[in-house]
């Protein structure tokens, strides 16, 4: 996708989104269905079955909160957050941890970025990614060239590096959605 600011002050390197990472074996053992929506995750059957990143410690966690408020509107978004909180086992200190916990069979459901689950998928772990039917929060990682910075030549060299094929490949490998 084209991720460029109209005045060329910044450009996107890649995009990534929040996902529901589920361990299908654990769900089956606990008699739980695979959630298909955020509404599903608010049901009492999922109490203490979900881990998500702490929004105070993780940009991934903050992205989820922002996505709920943006996607559902402020009033309903905060209602979703409060109901989801009631089902939370705990909040992880990193965005990657809930995906890893689901992949390793520690929890049935981890809210994380699908990109964090990629390394586990090649080992045929019983995990899958669910994109809730209401939509997901997403973010773009970007590069900007600051005006009036103390090292303009170095900043421009970094800009050029970020726009190059090496960073593009890293972005594609990480998130699958390179700019």
Residue ranges of each PLM-predicted region?
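Ligand-binding "clamshell"
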Residues: 1, 5-7, 119-131
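Extracytoplasmic ligand-binding site segments that recognize negatively charged/polar headgroups
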Residues: 1-106
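A bilobed periplasmic-binding-protein/Venus flytrap-type ligand-binding module shared by bacterial periplasmic
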Residues: 21-26, 139-152, 170-171
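Short secondary-structure boundary segments
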Residues: 24, 54, 114-115, 174-175
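Periplasmic-binding protein-like
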Residues: 46-53, 80-85, 91-92, 123-147, 161-178
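Short, hydrophobic alpha-helical packing/hinge segments within bilobed ligand-binding/sensory domains
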Residues: 98-99, 117, 155, 168
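A ligand-binding cleft/hinge motif common to bilobed small-molecule-binding domains
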Residues: 103, 107-126
């Amino acid at each position: 996708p084209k991720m460029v600011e109209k005045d060329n002050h910044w450009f996107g390197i890649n995009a990534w989104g929040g996902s529901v990472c589920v361990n299908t074996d654990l769900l089956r053992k606990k008699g739980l269905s695979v959630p298909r929506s955020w509404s599903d995750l608010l049901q009492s059957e999922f109490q203490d079955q979900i881990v998500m990143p702490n929004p105070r410690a993780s940009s991934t966690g903050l992205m989820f909160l922002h996505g709920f408020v943006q996607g559902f509107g402020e009033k309903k978004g905060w209602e979703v957050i409060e109901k989801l909180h009631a089902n939370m086992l705990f909040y992880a200190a990193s965005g990657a941890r809930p995906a890893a916990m689901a992949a390793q069979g520690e929890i049935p459901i981890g809210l994380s970025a699908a990109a964090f689950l990629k390394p586990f998928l090649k080992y045929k772990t019983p995990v899958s990614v669910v994109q809730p039917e209401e939509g997901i929060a997403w973010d773009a990682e970007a590069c900007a060239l600051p005006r009036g910075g103390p090292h303009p030549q170095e900043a421009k060299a970094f800009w050029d590096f970020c726009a190059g094929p090496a960073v593009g490949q890293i972005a594609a490998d990480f998130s699958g959605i390179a700019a």
